[in-house]
Amino acid sequence: DCEKQMHGKINSAFYGYAERVWFMSEKQKNMILEKVTALKDENCAVLNSVFSGGDLRFMLSIKDNEKDNKYLILDSVSPVKPSALAVAYAEENNLEYELISDLQYHELLIKMSTSKGLIFLPQASDTCPRLVMEAKMLGCQLVLNEHVQHKDEPWFETMMSCYEHMDSRADAFWSYYE
């Protein structure tokens, strides 16, 4: 009942007067539209995320690296993104895995490009996790749950459709303001 509390009413007014509200996933947009009646669908757009052209080109250049048999798991104690469930999944399914943390960004991308997959099982809604998009664009097999909100969107279907969609996001954003 957040929308009935004072902070919810303030958010509703903020959304209602906005010229454009950008969302990270269709599910996120639909959840907000359902709760915030002041917000109109025609003022909404789903951007997902924006990557730099350089990072997209880097991912494209390493996506075909030889893969090992390991699934990567984000080493996290966050209550929303705990690693414990992913570790349990890997162990129950006899999957070789490696916990990852504290890697520089391009090191992480290289690690993903040489790994079989990613296990990512958040405990609450995660609108559009970049780690999952990066793993997809790098050819990783994905083990995800229903909390990864963008996982069923058409652009996320294949490695190349994901890459092409992400490559269009900066233009999609800026073209609105031109």
Segment roles from a protein language model:
Residues 2-21, 113:
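Membrane-proximal helix-turn-helix segments that form the acceptor-binding/catalytic region
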Residues 10-11, 105-109, 131:
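Acidic, amphipathic alpha-helical patches
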Residues 13, 89, 111, 134:
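Hydrophobic/aromatic ligand-binding patch that stacks against planar heteroaromatic rings
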Residues 16-43, 82, 178:
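A short, active-site helix/loop in glycosyltransferases that binds the activated sugar's phosphate group
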Residues 17-19, 68, 114-116, 139:
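Short, well-ordered alpha-helix to beta-strand connector turns
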Residues 49-108:
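Conserved catalytic-core segment of nucleotide-activated headgroup transferases in glycan assembly
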Residues 105-115, 137:
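Short acidic alpha-helix that forms the nucleotide-activated donor recognition element
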Residues 121-178:
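Catalytic binding pocket for nucleotide-activated donors in carbohydrate/polymer assembly enzymes
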